[in-house]
Amino acid sequence: MEELQGYLKIDRSRERDFLYPLLFQEYIYALAHDHGLNKSILYEPMENLGYDKKYSLIIVKRLITRMYQQKHLIIFTNDSNPNFFFGHNKNLDSQMISEGVAVIVELPFSLRLVSSPESKEIDKSMTTLRSIHSIFPFLEDKLLHLNHVLDILIPYPIHLELLVQTLRSWIQDAPFLHLLRFFLYKYHNWNSLITQKTKMILFFSKENQRFFLFLYNFHVYESESIFVFLRKQSYHLRSTSSRAFLDRTHFYRKIEHFLVDFRNDFHTILWLFKDPFIQYFRFQGKSILSSKGTPLLMKKWKYYLVNLWECHFYFWSQPDRIHINQLSNHFIDFLGYLSSVRPTPSAVRSQMLEKSFIIDIVIKKFDTIVPIIPMIGSLAKAKFCNFSGHPISKPAWADSSDSDIIDRFGRICRNLSHYYSGSSKKKSLYRIKYILRLSCARTLARKHKSTVRSFLKRLGSEFLEEFLMEEEQVLSFILPRISYFSKRLYKERIWYFDIIRINDLTNLS
């Protein structure tokens, strides 16, 4: 962010966000190269396009020169595919400009975040809550006292033009919005992709993931902005602040009219939803709203959210995208774990003088387990096993060396062990390790044209244990290696604070 400020020399005159001229600046494409999601064409292998693997400033200079020479930045032809750029290498030019657009469109939001008074508090919280594992201790602390939960899938816009209209409240530069609209229609299949129930990130365009990640995050941010506003206002009914109310271009006028004419109704709505025990958390398009309230209150929340999305944001919210469940008999599918709050009966023996009593009590326990059936499906899609869970060889890796094959399988196994270390029951995790171990052995046997039994008999089974036991070796440095404790260790949940993204195999499920 400091680097961007140094380039742009931000001052008061830039508050109107004129972003279109930035497309003609070389440093924008350099930033796309430096901060890309490892998929930038500026440094990815481009054998099919005839360019080097490294970032080339000459390519950028030629692109900017061609943009200056054209009367219009984008030329549409009569062809059914309106992606013709400058009569040159249209694929390369289109992708380079889209990467520049991805950097530029983030500037108004990033700069406002840095200049906001809340930015320092956000920076402090991010240093301690950087890992997505940090949410599970929070859930364990909060969900034990709640009764019901709303499983919510964030709805999607019914048309791509709604995304552009929403961005108008943040970006006032009309030419840049027209260019953004073009790229949305260039990836016209995005509307059909976001309707899938599968994880969104896997379906983003491989050409420019950063561009679509930003659009999707902004879409989700807008969809829950008013909900967050109402949640805050439920504790401050006398407050009339509108800074947190993110709406369209003329939202100040709307809010003023709203507060004057409908103040009593607004406070009545807030009173209906006032719940000091409500908790809300989200990851990507999946959000959870839990409460200690009655089922009637949860139905009100569901009715309100559906009407809010459909009437205010024009989002298509299907009935099956919000489910009301009771925590005591329902698993929460979140971040690749199945979490639940189960009542656990226990007996307490109390001694009083010469008499003893046995008291039966029920304690709520927060459990997190590995969803074994979806994980087997993910392993089957990745060609490590069939859909019944039987390990198979990986023919695509058979051409690699033995050490590379073992290293690949070992890395996947260690990453899964690392990510699912918080599981309450390790049996499912051991089954996944077994599938990967035998798949590795079958791949090596296929390479050497031998059977698994004869191959393991010749080399010994110890060579596969090395990459499977590395996770335990790391734990031995962190925690004391006591025999009693080490046996208990694998039954306990361990949360790591260095995990910044969900596991790839979990995304496939």
Curated annotation (Swiss-Prot):
Gene Ontology MF annotations: RNA binding
Domain of life: Eukaryota
Signal peptide: none
One Gene Ontology term, aspect cellular component: chloroplast
UniProt keyword terms in alphabetical order: Chloroplast, mRNA processing, Plastid, RNA-binding, tRNA processing
Main location class: plastid
Subcellular location: Plastid, Chloroplast
GO biological process entries: mRNA processing; RNA splicing; tRNA processing
Function: Usually encoded in the trnK tRNA gene intron. Probably assists in splicing its own and other chloroplast group II introns.
Family named by the database record: Belongs to the intron maturase 2 family. MatK subfamily.
Protein name: Maturase K
Gene giving rise to this polypeptide: matK
